[in-house]
């Protein structure tokens, strides 16, 4: 996505759903959410990381983490990572299993895209990687919010 005007937002009218930035950095939070959200989708790239690797990642100045709550219960999260070329990647994004199917994913993604554009006036692109291991409707959600496919790759198994 190359402009905030391309966003087609989806709002959650349920006031019990709230999204907040984690102002106090805690690499364990990033690790635990990655493991909890990603377990269902077989996220494995960081599963073997040491605590030191998680600390370096979770405390990196270019990373911002947001958590979603439903009735004060943790429901999901997303991470935004700014690069040196004006891009912001939605590095990780997802809901905990018990919150999937409640219509919250579109609102969570809308928040992620809006916050990515707010990171700096110099942001020129917001992007995300997805794969066939993600939720079956992940790509449809990205496209419904205005994102377009940039490139397809076949991964070796």
Q: What does each of the following model-derived ranges do?
A:
Residues 1-23:
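Acyl-donor-binding surface of acyltransferase catalytic domains
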Residues 15-39:
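Short, contiguous, helix-prone interaction/anchoring segments in small proteins
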Residues 38-53:
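Conserved GNAT-fold acetyl-CoA-binding loop/helix
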Residues 82-91, 100, 122-124:
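A conserved beta-turn-beta hairpin within the catalytic core of GNAT-like acetyltransferases
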Residues 100, 126-138, 155-157:
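Conserved beta-strand-loop-alpha-helix junction that forms the acyl-donor binding cleft
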Residues 92-95, 101-118, 139-144:
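Conserved acetyl-CoA-binding loop-helix of GNAT-fold acetyltransferases
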Residues 55-67:
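A short helix-loop-beta-strand connector motif used in the catalytic cores of GNAT acetyltransferases and
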Residues 67, 73-82, 89-94:
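Conserved beta-strand in the GNAT
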């Amino acid at each position: 996505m190359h402009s905030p005007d391309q966003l087609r937002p989806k709002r959650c009218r349920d006031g019990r759903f709230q999204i907040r930035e984690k102002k106090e950095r805690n690499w364990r939070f990033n690790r635990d959410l990655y493991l909890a959200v990603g377990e269902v989708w077989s996220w494995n790239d960081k599963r073997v990381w040491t605590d030191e690797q998680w600390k370096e990642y979770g405390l990196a100045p270019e990373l911002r983490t947001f958590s979603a709550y439903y009735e004060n219960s943790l429901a999901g999260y997303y991470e935004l990572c700014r690069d040196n070329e004006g891009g912001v990647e939605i590095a990780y994004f997802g809901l905990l299993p018990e919150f999937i199917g409640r219509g919250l994913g579109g609102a969570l993604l809308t928040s992620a895209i809006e916050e990515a554009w707010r990171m700096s006036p110099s942001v020129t692109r917001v992007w995300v990687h997805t794969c066939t291991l993600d939720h079956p409707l992940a790509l449809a959600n990205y496209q419904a919010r205005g994102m377009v496919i940039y490139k397809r790759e076949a991964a070796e198994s």
